[in-house]
Amino acid sequence: IAQCLVGSEMCIRDRSIGCYERTIALLLEKYAGALPFWLAPTQVKVLSITDRAAERANEIRDLLEENGIRTEVDNRNEKIGYKIREAQLEKVPYMLILGDKEVENGVVSVRHRKNGDLGQMDINELLKIMLADVKNKNLEV
């Protein structure tokens, strides 16, 4: 890291940004922060509604991470609307919502960043869709 003193200011770097930085900056500008699924830092956020669904949420995270899907779990004791809004602001491509009904039926309620509510799906069926998006490097946000 190059350092130079100019008056009372200090610049950390005196070179233009590099190739990788320019590419990331271009992608962030083009997609307004809503990166394609395969490129998003957090691809899936699992949101549990009840404490009883928290264990299943962790199991789903483990399954997705075993398959290379970057996943976070939100087991906080907050209203589900608040959790969904927070995930939308973070521009997470998929939100998986788990309550007692979903756990009982062995499904997840799926919300997509762009397409909204996709209804209930089997996690393995959804995983196939996600893996296909990663493999094809789909640019749709």
Regions found by a protein language model. Give the residues of each.
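Short acidic (Asp/Glu) and glycine-rich catalytic loops that position anionic groups and cofactors
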Residues: 8, 37-42, 109-111
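C-terminal structured "cap/appendage" subdomains that terminate the fold
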Residues: 61-130
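Conserved phosphate/anionic-ligand binding catalytic regions in large, soluble enzymes, centered on
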Residues: 13-27
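Intein/HINT protein-splicing elements and their conserved insertion hotspots or analogous self-processing inserts
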Residues: 123, 131-141
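Hydrophobic alpha-helical scaffolding
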Residues: 13-17, 50, 120
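Generic long, charged, amphipathic alpha-helical segments
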Residues: 31-85
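Single conserved hydrophobic/aromatic residue that forms the stacking wall/gate
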Residues: 1-7, 12
